[in-house]
């Protein structure tokens, strides 16, 4: 288990730096099929964790979840996440469609996309 590097702390602005310094990253090659990352509280599990330069969209996405956990607390976040998934699964009848319909996932994908766009604009051409 590792902490975010200084490059990652500088790059990932999707959560407050004070919270980012408390994040732990754990490589977990055996995540569920189709999943590259998962977050529980301030621990981020990544299928691959070989790049530590602050350039990975999956890390930005998972760090949004760290912030969501922090803002709501563990139990409220999990209750809302799972109820969002259950409602979406009832509606869509397929796991993948239900996953993408979870409000917390939509927010994390949107913020990671915005983060990547800001990063692209800031980098010299």
Labelled PLM ranges:
Residues 64-72:
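Active-site-flanking alpha-helical
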Residues 36-39, 43-60, 70, 98-101:
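Short pre-active-site segment immediately N-terminal to the catalytic Zn-binding motif
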Residues 46, 64, 112-114:
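Generic hydrophobic/packing signal
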Residues 1-36, 53, 73-125:
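Metalloprotease/metallohydrolase-associated module, dominated by Zn2+-dependent proteases
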């Amino acid at each position: 288990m590792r902490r975010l590097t200084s490059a990652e702390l500088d790059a990932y602005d999707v959560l407050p730096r004070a919270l980012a310094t408390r994040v732990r990253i754990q490589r977990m090659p055996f995540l569920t099929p189709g999943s590259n990352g998962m977050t529980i509280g301030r621990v981020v599990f990544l299928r691959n964790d070989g790049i530590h330069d602050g350039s990975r969209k999956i890390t930005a996405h998972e760090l949004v979840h760290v912030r969501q956990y922090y803002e709501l607390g563990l139990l409220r976040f999990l209750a809302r996440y799972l109820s969002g998934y259950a409602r979406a699964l009832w509606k869509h009848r397929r796991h993948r469609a239900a996953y993408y319909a979870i409000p917390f996932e939509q927010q994390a994908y949107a913020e990671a996309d915005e983060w990547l766009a800001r990063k692209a604009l800031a980098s010299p051409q």
